[in-house]
Amino acid sequence: MIDSKLFTPASIGPLTLRNRTIRSAAFESMCPGNVPSQQLLDYHRSVAAGGVGMTTIAYAAVAQSGLSFDRQLWMRPEIVPGLKDITDAIHKEGAAAGIQLGDCGNMSHKSICGVTPVGASSGFNLYSPTFVRGLRKDELPAMAKAYGRSVNLAREAGFDAVEIHAGHGYLISQFLSPYTNHRKDEYGGSLENRMRFMDMVMEEVMQAAGSDMAVLVKMNMRDGFKGGMEIDETMQVAKRLVQDGAQALVLSGGFVSKAPMYVMRGEMPIKTMTHYMNCWWLKYGVRMAGKWMIPAVPFKEAYFLEDALKFRTEIKDIPLVYVGGLVSREKIDEVLNHGFEFVQMARALLNEPGFVNRMREEEKARCNCKHSNYCIARMYTIEMACHQHLREELPASLKKEIEKLEKK
């Protein structure tokens, strides 16, 4: 038997997990009408039953203006009972329950969130596509308080941990990055100024979390394109988050509106993506320009590890969570042996919810995810799913596209 930390318990703040695995907060797209569903419960229960230490419900908006999708959770009192059903189901399977809280900022559209999208600065977001209004200085305290209110709702719903989304080009990330923050006040310009909104959010979060909820923060190590944040700045962000009270950092990267495949790696199956789209003009536009809008970034297992190791060297005070392209027991053990306290997975557990249990039995266990990104291509319109487990037959043209990508 290899020397492995994988199935040893470890703690994040007040929370102890039964092992080192966490289902990452990959968007499920299972909440039509912005409310929890039986499908969401069934999926997270299956992952918990599959042996994971904690499973994380993804991308819950702290305000209506922060919604990117009409199948995304929106935190408000009326959804607490539905969320409580989910946390109860997760706990019965022996896993902890986490929820990711965030605000999409400019990554929305009036048809989804009901207002002109807001962000760190005014401009035009080609991703949506839509004009964006920069948040006024006097609006920022209320926006920060929305995070704190959402933490309190998460506690009522029985969650053990919250993960604050400060990466991937969403609202906090939009304030941090010089690419999206063009403000002339004390919230723009220098890195110190660009961190002010994050500090404000974390103050509200930590006050609401108190001593009984674990607080993780997902952050970028790099934005993934020229003109975005690089490690010299993000290392300072990580150190500030430690000062702000974060109890673990999830080390990621990428910017959904500018470098989406830097987050996920591989190639987006454009034909599949547009097949599921409802909006005719968006379907046509993505079909014509998708390869340019969503350029491929080569996939390799543990693709963020080289950068993450730099943070492991500098950040000693709190646990670091590695996320990014893990599909085998061998690579997971390697990452843990590098000193990371936890690992996160999403696509591996979508492909095989019981993967963690299988790893307990097999030292050479490897899931069957082939990195076609079919699950992500459909996620923008309908629920996230692995094409290997569909009940319906895929159209021949989509099968051909997926098979081609899986051979790369």
Regions found by a protein language model. Give the residues of each.
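Flavin-dependent oxidoreductase catalytic cores
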Residues: 1-408
